[in-house]
Amino acid sequence: QVYRGMDIGTAKATPEERRLVPHHMIDICDPDYPFSVAEFQERAAALIEDIHRRGKLPFLVGGTGLYVESVCYGFSFSEGGADESYRAELNEYADRFGNASLHEKLREIDPASAARIHPNDRRRTIRALEVYRLTGVPLSEHLAGQKKESPYECCIIGLTMNREKLYRRIDE
């Protein structure tokens, strides 16, 4: 929901909904901007602090589980930086052999991350492989050691939707 123009399939609040209730971090960057979970966490924490200062109750709505948990549990992101040449190599591999083959490489070194990341989510698959290459430690182990006592009083609610209904809604 942070990306401009990415409205289909994101359940992004409509302009009318945004007029009724203040929303933050919607349409804040272009789709080609590499918006990371660490940046999300930093921006969300600043907004939460600002909203609290104004005597209001913030709601963190939407996003992936990792993004929400990073804010609620104060994850620290020190998985070794980035390796652009390795990312390019993995992208070329996926272009040639497919996302499923790339995902299988992840399953071999980090079954827990592979179980959590969809085989077609190339970006997250590559990031998990990159973290392992840079640190020698699977991403799942990095994440397992990061959950802390929440700095906030959180109430986490998850919603699901019937798959057929979801696809119909996306098609509309």
Per-range role (PLM):
Residues Q1-E172:
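Phosphate/pyrophosphate-binding catalytic cores of soluble transferases and nucleic-acid-acting enzymes
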